[in-house]
Amino acid sequence: MRTEWVAKRRGQVNVSQMHYARQGVITEEMHYVAQRENLPTDLIRDEVARGRMIIPANINHTNLEPMAIGIASKCKVNANIGASPNSSNLQEEVDKLNLAVKYGADTVMDLSTGGGNLDEIRTAIIKASPVPIGTVPVYQALESVHGTIENLTADDFLHIIEKHAQQGVDYQTIHAGILIEHLPLVRNRITGIVSRGGGILARWMLHHHKQNPLYTHFQDIIEIFKRYDVSFSLGDSLRPGCTHDASDEAQLAELKTLGQLTRKAWEDDVQVMVEGPGHVPMDQIEFNVRKQMEECSEAPFYVLGPLVTDIAPGYDHITSAIGAAMAGWYGTAMLCYVTPKEHLGLPNAEDVRNGLIAYKIAAHAADIARHRPGARDRDDELSKARYNFDWNRQFELSLDPERAKEYHDETLPADIYKTAEFCSMCGPKFCPMQTKVDADALTELEKFLAKEPVTQS
């Protein structure tokens, strides 16, 4: 789809969407996004130029269908997939990708740490994906030194980062915000450092007593990202891993650094979004969103959850979707899904489905609350179908049509019940939606009420 679009850009020093937007150019990707979002093309260009919106679109991911992440666009959902040393393989990950796209993932992150050749897995995922692909290059950097963190060098990180860019990765989580001076701030936490990438960098700094190499070589990463139009997803290495640790000094110190790095990337017209927590009580979610906007100059916020309680292993797609809906309402641009397997194991296909649907609900609820154009249209159409007992239309409009039909058909499977004016909840005699009050009847009632006082029986 994008082969012709990007052909004329190849070889230029900077091919980022932000670079073109700041020159006043409306790219084909911006036109495409404007149509998808039902927004003016000028607004898309201006938001990208300002840094409040990103269009993650590596020039080597030519089968990508461009999308936007930003406060002016619909709230988006990311799904994580990835093989581990103990579970999964290439085909399973491609199957998970296809499932994630089927159930509405706007982007997908490949978090593979093992399970085969990581380059082959990543290449297969990018080739198969119409949505932006994100990665965490620190994972493969660690694999390249056989898991010995102390042996990692800045060149190891940069080599893997460029490899991912060359392969077509659209955005990369870069854990450049955790600094050596931040590490003592986690002393009073219950769960310490829960970011895998952050933990790797922390151990490296503790061993070498040197500054984070991703921070000291941040300009080198910018130069790579300019050449391929890779977007930064600035990792929150010190995100809270439990509600006790939320909004603490460590988290906020790193957030301030992430704001500085955001503005540094913008100096070279490189797109940025900023990752956020995590585990946050409901009463602190608005503060966290507002604080990110303040520190990071309104760069798009991308949060994991947040989980609003820590006591529901097996149900963390619910505990986190509650926080995600609130975060989206307050202005978070993208929500990273959490599956029922969070904290327990690697998610399977059914976990991916359940996590995604929970987060599509959260994102859609946020869009309605923020009065985004057309956000409630689908709700209204489904409500009309429900009132008219148009069961097949209800299924069609559902976020998960197969599940809706499956639940209906558990008790009323025959085709005749697809036109029935009841379901198994109320049966044929008690459904209140059978009470159809037409306009003429209401007009007559209004005339009566205007003339006669209502008597109490």
From Swiss-Prot:
Belongs to the ThiC family. Zn(2+) binds at residues 279, 343. It comes from the Bacteria. The keyword S-adenosyl-L-methionine applies. The lineage of its organism: Bacteria, Bacillati, Cyanobacteriota, Cyanophyceae, Nostocales. Catalyzes the synthesis of the hydroxymethylpyrimidine phosphate (HMP-P) moiety of thiamine from aminoimidazole ribotide (AIR) in a radical S-adenosyl-L-methionine (SAM)-dependent reaction. One of its GO terms (cellular component) is cytosol. Its EC number is 4.1.99.17. NCBIfam families: PRK09284.1, PRK13352.1, thiC. Binds 1 [4Fe-4S] cluster per subunit. The cluster is coordinated with 3 cysteines and an exchangeable S-adenosyl-L-methionine. Signal peptide: none annotated. This is Phosphomethylpyrimidine synthase. Substrate binds at residues 80, 109, 139, 175, 195-197, 236-239, 275, 302. It catalyses: 5-amino-1-(5-phospho-beta-D-ribosyl)imidazole + S-adenosyl-L-methionine = 4-amino-2-methyl-5-(phosphooxymethyl)pyrimidine + CO + 5'-deoxyadenosine + formate + L-methionine + 3 H(+). GO terms for biological process: thiamine biosynthetic process; thiamine diphosphate biosynthetic process. One of its GO terms (molecular function) is zinc ion binding. The keyword Iron-sulfur applies. Pathway: Cofactor biosynthesis; thiamine diphosphate biosynthesis. Its cofactor is [4Fe-4S] cluster. InterPro entries: ThiC, ThiC/Bza_core_dom, ThiC/BzaA/B. Keywords: 4Fe-4S, Iron, Iron-sulfur, Lyase, Metal-binding, S-adenosyl-L-methionine, Thiamine biosynthesis, Zinc. It comes from Nostoc punctiforme (strain ATCC 29133 / PCC 73102).
